[in-house]
Amino acid sequence: MPPRKAHTTRRTPAKKSGVRRRLLRLLVTGVPVLALCGVAWLWLESVRLTRIEIVGARQADPGELRRLAAVDSGAALFDLDPALIADRVARHPWVQAASVTRWPTGTLRIAVEERVPVVLQMDAGGRPLRYLDAEGYGMPPGRGPVPDVPLLYGVRGPAHPMRPLEDEPVRALLTTLAALEDPARALISEIVRAPDGEFWLYTTPAAGQRSVPVRLGREDFERRLRRLVAFWQQAVLTQPHKTFSLIDLRFANQIVVREEAHPSTQKSAMGHE
């Protein structure tokens, strides 16, 4: 068998020239890019914090938010951790969420989303104590406009400023109130939790009516408040000549009311539609 001939591949001058051209192009384009990246990195390292911008704070004091952020003026801006700063700011009672953006101009932008108050909790002496949101978190009176929310009496806590109320019936009621439309929410002036745990509402005086006590009970708040709104629109606002002294929502198939037609008082029951 004849021996095999070894084949070798030789690069032609044209191929060698093409490789050189590609290497040259890489050098021409790559070196400036690397240099530019280096300059950009050095420039970012040189950017210093010159301003802290607070956005979205209406009730929370911007000065307190800056203090919670705990960043020094003149610090290297892009060495700061946005997530860490946002977590610090979110410890403010009014702040539900926070986000932090670093701008090359030297500005640190802190945007906050504040909690929405549902009621104003009153202390045992009838003085404003704190606002409560839908989740049961407490917020102290803020610096902005006074929120128009019902007053809440007879409730303790929350025990910790960073934790919500542990009272489940109260939290259920707060969630229900937060979901109400504005006209329905405006119907409620005060909420009282009696020593036996039962909730009473007092309506906002309107249409010739005094504030009417409403017996809400201990549960099923969403359905009962819907029935109250429907009854108020259909039976109270349409009959301004009638004076109601009590509305009882505890029964499944009817709303029990007490009317004051004359000096005498009579009881009546109205079926729920």
Swiss-Prot record:
Span of domain POTRA: 47-115
Subcellular location: Cell inner membrane
Membrane topology field: Single-pass type II membrane protein
Family matches, as Pfam families: FtsQ_DivIB_C (PF03799), POTRA_1 (PF08478)
Key words, A-Z: Cell cycle, Cell division, Cell inner membrane, Cell membrane, Membrane, Transmembrane, Transmembrane helix
Cytoplasmic compartment segments: 1-20
GO biological process, one term: FtsZ-dependent cytokinesis
Periplasmic topological segments: 44-273
Entry coiled-coil feature ranges: none
Entries under InterPro entries matching the protein: Cell_div_FtsQ/DivIB_C (IPR005548), FtsQ (IPR026579), FtsQ_C_sf (IPR045335), POTRA (IPR034746), POTRA_FtsQ_type (IPR013685)
Listed transmembrane segments: 21-43
GO CC field: cell division site; plasma membrane
Main location, first listed in the record: membrane
Biological role stated in the UniProt entry: Essential cell division protein.
HAMAP family membership: FtsQ_subfam
PANTHER family to which the protein is assigned, alphabetical: CELL DIVISION PROTEIN FTSQ
Family: Belongs to the FtsQ/DivIB family. FtsQ subfamily.
Protein known as: Cell division protein FtsQ
